[in-house]
């Protein structure tokens, strides 16, 4: 398994382009589209409510709760498929996770603007493992102070892991694009304190 580790100023990233084999990734992608209870939430930006520009779901152990930008997500139990992925992650990267935020980007018009995963319930220096299924999308990072930028093309079956102080010093996004018309599912595994 090819692993690219990138040490950044104020954090690190690991990128594994073939974390899942294609057959398993294809089946998981189809299963999640059909079995997950997707919802479109509302977030508060600059005092105004907006529909999230993607669909979401949240699964966690022990009814752990998670929210951001003025919304709390409904907590569901881990499915069999999500548990399999979680166990594989634990074996491969040596970190265990108690929750996963799922995002369904229906087309290139769905997005996730500049943000950091720095909510208090994630702890001081969270490790976030982001698994991609479906359409390839560009993932951008930007340093808060130096404005240095870095981009990855997150392909079907790949995983990007963020750690160290990254969430304190960098923001990331999935920008809108007219080049993509197919859906993408992103699973962001994390630990809720």
Please describe what each predicted stretch is.
Residues 1-193:
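Non-heme Fe(II) oxygenase metal-center motifs and adjacent flexible, charged/small-residue loops
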């Amino acid at each position: 398994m090819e692993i690219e580790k990138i040490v950044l100023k104020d954090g690190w990233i690991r990128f594994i382009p073939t974390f899942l084999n294609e057959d398993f990734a294809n089946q998981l992608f189809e299963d999640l589209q059909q079995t997950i209870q997707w919802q479109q939430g509302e977030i508060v930006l600059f005092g105004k409510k907006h529909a999230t520009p993607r669909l979401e779901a949240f699964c966690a152990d022990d009814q752990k709760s998670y929210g951001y930008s003025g919304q709390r997500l409904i907590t569901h139990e881990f499915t069999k498929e999500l548990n399999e992925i979680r166990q594989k992650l634990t074996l491969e990267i040596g970190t265990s996770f108690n929750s996963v935020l799922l995002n369904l980007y229906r087309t290139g018009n769905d997005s996730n603007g500049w943000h950091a995963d720095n909510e208090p319930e994630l702890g001081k220096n969270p490790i976030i493992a982001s698994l991609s299924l479906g359409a390839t999308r560009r993932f951008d990072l930007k340093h808060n102070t130096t404005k240095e930028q870095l981009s990855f093309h997150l392909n079907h079956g790949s995983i990007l892991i963020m750690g160290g102080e990254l969430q304190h010093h960098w923001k990331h996004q999935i920008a809108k694009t007219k080049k993509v018309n197919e859906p993408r599912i992103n699973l962001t595994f994390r630990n809720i304190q």
